Curated annotation (Swiss-Prot):
The EC number(s) this enzyme carries: 2.7.7.60
Enzyme type, top EC level: transferase
Protein name: 2-C-methyl-D-erythritol 4-phosphate cytidylyltransferase
Superkingdom classification of source: Bacteria
InterPro entries hit by this protein: IspD, IspD/TarI, IspD/TarI_cytidylyltransf_bact, ISPD_synthase_CS, Nucleotide-diphossugar_trans
Lineage of source species: Bacteria, Bacillati, Cyanobacteriota, Cyanophyceae, Synechococcales
GO biological process annotation, one example: isopentenyl diphosphate biosynthetic process, methylerythritol 4-phosphate pathway
PROSITE patterns on file: ISPD
Job of this protein: Catalyzes the formation of 4-diphosphocytidyl-2-C-methyl-D-erythritol from CTP and 2-C-methyl-D-erythritol 4-phosphate (MEP).
Keyword match Glycoprotein: no
């Protein structure tokens, strides 16, 4: 399985003053923990890290023994552009790809393998968890408009897996139509292409704030 990891997080909400994937988690960088999980998955055979050139040396150095196993890909101005750069950098024989947020460093390798396996039967899959909170849709003035049925609500995670040719086509169409999305599954939705949900775990959090880092430390100490 080919694997792409967007790794351009600025760390502004973490107040880190550097790429957040360089932040320490129990003695190792976040990107190190992410790669440890990715390479622990039996389906992984090629990994590309997509980041900004200024971060290249620091990120690769922080991955330690994994540095010689990954391929560096220069990112774009947005996550969407960066993923498209990653798709163009894949080996010509790549048929399937998993895309995973670099800041989701607690991903279970077995879930990675499950996503890879599900691509044998689906052209697009994503990890997600059932929403347990009551969600409110509000208007521009902050008043509640409606409460959607949470039985139909899922919180999207990564990895998100796709057939490479299909995802490339979706990205090219997004460029032509000037679409801007926050994840790749959204492109498939806009094109009315099916995306299969695979139930993930609540531990697969994205590190975006100091409280997330504290939670991640608990999971690392108590796997």
């Amino acid at each position: 399985m080919h694997f792409l990891i967007p790794a351009a997080g600025s760390g502004s909400r973490m107040k880190a003053g550097k790429n957040k994937l360089l932040i320490d988690l129990e003695g190792e960088s976040l990107i190190y923990w992410t790669l440890k999980s990715v390479f622990s998955a039996s389906s992984t055979n090629w990994v590309g890290i997509i980041g900004q050139p200024k971060d290249k040396n620091l990120l690769l150095n922080s991955t330690k023994d994994f540095a010689h196993k990954v391929h560096w890909i220069n990112g774009g101005d947005t996550r969407q552009q960066s993923v498209f750069n990653g798709l163009k950098a894949l080996p010509k024989d790549a048929e399937k790809v998993l895309i995973h947020d670099g800041a989701r460093c607690l991903i279970n390798p077995e879930l990675i393998d499950l996503c890879a396996k599900q691509l044998d039967e689906n052209e697009a899959v994503i990890l997600a968890t059932k929403v347990t909170d009551t969600i409110k849709i509000v208007d521009n003035e902050g008043f509640i408009k409606e409460t959607p049925d949470r039985n139909y609500l899922w919180a999207a995670q990564t990895p998100q897996g796709f057939l490479v040719d299909r995802l490339k086509k979706a990205h090219k169409m997004a460029i032509d139509k000037n679409w801007n999305v926050t994840d790749d599954a959204s492109l498939f939705e806009m094109l009315n292409w099916k995306v299969k949900i695979i139930e993930g775990t609540y531990s697969n959090i994205k590190i975006t704030s100091p409280i997330d880092l504290k939670i991640a430390k608990l999971f690392v100490k108590n796997p």
